[in-house]
Amino acid sequence: MKKWKAAGLITVAGACVIAIVWGLHGRTKNNAKLLQLDEQVSDDSVIYVALGDSITYGYSLEHAENERFSARIAAYMKQQGMQVVECNQGVNGQLSDDMWQNIKKGKVDLLDHADYVTFCIGTNDALLPFEFFVMQYEDYFYGYSGAGDDSSLWKKINKKTFVRDFEEADRSAEDNLNRFCNNLSDSIDLIRKASPDCRIAIMTLYNPYRNMDYEISAGGITINIGQYAEEKISQANTIISTVCKEKNIVLADCYEAFASSNDIVLNNQNAENYIDPDDHPTAVGQQLIADVFIEALFTK
C-alpha cells in the first residue's frame, strides 16, 4: 500500500480557511467595483452575473479580472456585438447556502436586471468537510516526512477516533449535499422571479483530486482521496443535472471537459505528488470553463 502523501490536500484545506478570509476581502473589492458597474449600465446593456465560489472569483490567477472564465465569456459576448456589463459575484470559500442567502437578502447587485447568469457552485459543499478532516490528521498523513499508514507514528493514533471523525465528516458532506439541492433550486426560483427572461447556465464540477490514488486503512475501512472525491463530486453533479432538467436550465458539462483534457488545467497538476496546495484552475482551465459555457449558452 502506498503511503498517503496528503500534503497537497491538507494544504488545500488550510487554503480554504485562508480563502474564507480572502472572501471577505474580495467582497469589499467587489462592492467598490459594483458602484462602477452601476454607472456603466444603460438601456442597451446586457447584464451578465457570474455566481459562485473561488473558481468564479478567479482565485490564484495572476490577472483574475481578465483571466477568469466570466471575463472570457464577457469578452466573447462583446465580440458578438453585445454591450455587456460583467458582474462577477464569486466569493472565495462560498457554500451554496451562503450564495442562496445573499440572493435571498438582495445582496447580489444587478441580479434583478440580469440577462445571463452562470453558476459555479458546489465543490465546497461536497468536499470541504473531508478536507478539514484530513487537515485534522495532517501530522500522521505527511507521506513526504515519513509518516504514513505503516509508520510508527500512525500506529499510535486512536483508530476508533479516526474512523469516527471520518464518518462525521462524511455525514457533514451528505448534509451539505442535501441542502445543496434546495439551495440551487431556490436560488434559480428567486432569480427567475426577479428576471423572468434571464438565461441561466450551471456548470458540472470537476474532481480536483481525480488522479490522487493515495489511500489509508483503519478500523476496517479504506479511504482513497481520489475515489472519495469522485463519489462526492458525482453526487453534486447528479443534483446539478437534475435541477437543470426540472428547471429547464442550461447545463455546461465542465466535468467531462476537464476529465478529457490533456492540458494543464489545474495548478496541482504542475506539482509532483500534488505537493502544490492549489487545486484551482490555471488560466488554461479557466478558458476551458469559459469555452464550455459559451458553447452551452450561445451555440446550442
Language model segments and positions:
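Solvent-exposed loop/turn segments at secondary-structure junctions
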Residues: 54-57, 91-96, 123-128, 206-210, ...
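Short amphipathic alpha-helices and their capping/turn segments at secondary-structure boundaries
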Residues: 32-43, 99-117, 186-197
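N-terminal Sec-pathway targeting helices
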Residues: 1-14
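Catalytic His-Asp segment of secreted/periplasmic serine-dependent ester chemistry enzymes
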Residues: 205-300
